[in-house]
Amino acid sequence: MTAHRLLSRPSGRALASLTVLAGLTVLPAARAGGGVSITSYGHSALLIQGGGARVLLNPFQAVGCAAGLAEPRVSADVILASSQLRDEGAPVASGRFLVKPGSYRVAGLAIEGIGAPHDRVGGKRFGPSTLWRWRQGGLEIVHLGGTAGAIAAEDRVLLGRPDLLIIGVGGGAKIYDGQEAAAVVRQLQARRVIPVQYRAGGPSASCDLGSIQPFLNAMAGSTVRRVGSSFSVVPPVGDATVIELMR
C-alpha cells in the first residue's frame, strides 16, 4: 500500500486551536467528546453523526450484494467512499464526495485517506480503494469497509488504534474474509468494531459475500452486541474489543 501523509503543520494562531496526533490534525469541533450516533443503511453504508458533522460511508446502488436494500439517498457534510464501485461509491447521496487518498478538512473534521489495493492481487481485478481515518465526537474512527488487501506496517502506524473500526468481513474477491478481518482487528487493537459487507440472507448468484459467522468464530471470546439499525458510542470506550452487529 502507498501511504499518503499530506497534512501540513499549522502555524501562528492556528497552532493554539489544533491538535496533531500521529500525522492527523484534529480540529476543535471534531475534538469535542460528545460521541457519535451511527445509522446503518445496510451493506457498508453508515451515517455517522457527532461533533457537529454528518459523515456518510459507502453509499450504494441497489445492485449485486446490495440488491433489495433501500439506497441511502440522504444528505451529509462529507461522503467517504472506499471506491467508485456501484456498491460502495454510488452517486445517490448529497454532500462532498471523497474517494481519493489525501488529506482533507470538511465540516470541522480532519480526514486522512490512505491508498490501498481493493483485492488480494494488488488491485489488478478491482483497482484501488481508500482507507479512511478521522476523529469525530472525541473518537478515533477508521473505515476499512472496502478492501481485501493486507495492511502494511507503515499504514498501521497511520491508522493508529481506532476507538471505532468499520471493516468488511464477508470475503469474496474484494473484501476481507472472517479470518483476515479478525487479524486486522487484532493488528489495530480496535476497541469497537462494526462488521460490514457480509451476506445476511441465503446464497445469491449475484453476490460472492459470505455470512458473518466466520468472522464471529474468528473473534471468539470478544463481546458481541446486537445493536439494530442505530446506536451511539460515547467516549471513553475502554480497551476491550466489542463487536457491534448492526442490521
Which stretches of residues belong to each language-model region?
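Short acidic-hydrophobic surface loop/beta-edge motif
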Residues: I48, G102-A107, W132-W134, F231-P236
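Structural recognition of the beta-strand scaffold that forms the well-ordered cores
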Residues: L56-N58, L80-A81, E112-G113, E140-L144, ...
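Cleavable N-terminal signal peptides
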Residues: T19-V20, A30
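Sec/Tat signal peptide C-region and signal peptidase I cleavage site
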Residues: P28-G34
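Active-site-proximal loop/helix segments of hydrolase catalytic cores
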Residues: R120-L188, S204
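Bacterial N-terminal signal peptides that target proteins for export
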Residues: T2-L18
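Pre-active-site segment of Zn-dependent metallo-hydrolases
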Residues: Y41, A45-P101, E112-S129, T147-L158
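Binuclear metal-ion centers of metallo-dependent hydrolases, dominated by the metallo-beta-lactamase
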Residues: A110, R125-F126, R192-R247
